[in-house]
Amino acid sequence: MSAPYDLVCIGAGPTGLACAIEAKRAGLRTLVIDKGCLCNSLYHYPVNMIFFTTPELLEIGDLPLVCAAEKPTRVEALKYYRKAAEHYELDLRLGEQVTNVCGSDGRFEVHTRSGDGVTASYTARKIAVATGYYDLPNRLGVPGEDLPHVSHYYTEPHPFWRQDVVVIGGKNSAAEAALDLYRNGARVTLVHRQPALGANLKYWVRPDIENRIKAGQIRALFDTRITKIDRDFVFVSGPGEEQKLPAVQVFALTGYHPDFAFLRQLGVQLDPETNKPAMDPQTHESNVPGLYLAGVVIGGNHTSEIFIENGRFHGKQIVAALTGVTPPAPAT
């Protein structure tokens, strides 16, 4: 086995990359492991997505993100993070899933398995977990959810021109998908279990989706729950009636959550109500000595509290703790 790494970062999204860059700049031998591709969550975002934020708030490693318009696109962000990894010559193991972490502070053993079944292990003095949350959708828990025409991820509208599509959810992802589908010729029904759209819709999305609903261009069913999905219909129960909605495609855009089971496997204590992990807010060290947390995993169920914009600074706090430097104030 090779010499131990000073730090192994689990997760190669923007937060994990930022953490690895900070560690490398501090002279720490660092490895980044991810079960998917680089920035796997961003890769699975809608193809034509434009970020809500401006480019400087997505930057890591003091590298500028240059984009053609005011706000970066998904493609521009992916290119930027590839270039950042190349610039800092990060040591990456992509397509390797962490199956187990054993040992203790000062000498952890990280075991992985690749998609073709090849196993590997790495020794690390410290661990940073930055696994995000986009891999694990909040499931509906209804029959038919696993049918091939049901997806928890929206990609693009083209295949659904002149087709019946049901979008489930009432927050930004669902509203934007419904609008995109409508504008590209799909017949869209939006189903939401709450009595109204989410309170935190983007300021330019809310009037757009509300006007489309008011005009009857997008059908919306509020206070309505999904009861079953089959190959042709979505069965719903709403105020005073049950009905079935024709659908060649169903997008269940009901949110996502961190891998709490993995955190528990590592020994991290979670709050029984919020699932927020036990963690020192200054150093980001969990209750497991030598095991640090970064990014949205620290938010528990409240995934809307952590974004790339603030998660990208968590690595500075972690590396400051590892090198004995006074950590900066927690990112907000």
What annotation goes with each model-predicted range?
Residues 1-10, 25, 40, 44, ...:
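FAD-binding core/adjacent interface of flavoenzyme oxidoreductases
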Residues 2-5, 9-35, 153-197, 243, ...:
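Rossmann-like dinucleotide/flavin-binding elements
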Residues 5, 12-90, 175-203, 271-273:
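Beta1-alpha1 glycine-rich phosphate/pyrophosphate-binding loop at the start
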Residues 19, 42, 103, 138-140, ...:
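Short glycine-/acidic-enriched loop or helix-start segments at secondary-structure transitions
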Residues 23, 45-49, 107, 141-145, ...:
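Short, glycine/charged-enriched secondary-structure capping and boundary segments
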Residues 80, 208, 314-317:
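Alpha-helical elements of Rossmann-like donor-binding domains used by nucleotide-donor carbohydrate transfer enzymes
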Residues 87-124, 183-274, 326-332:
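A Rossmann-like FAD-binding core segment of flavoenzymes
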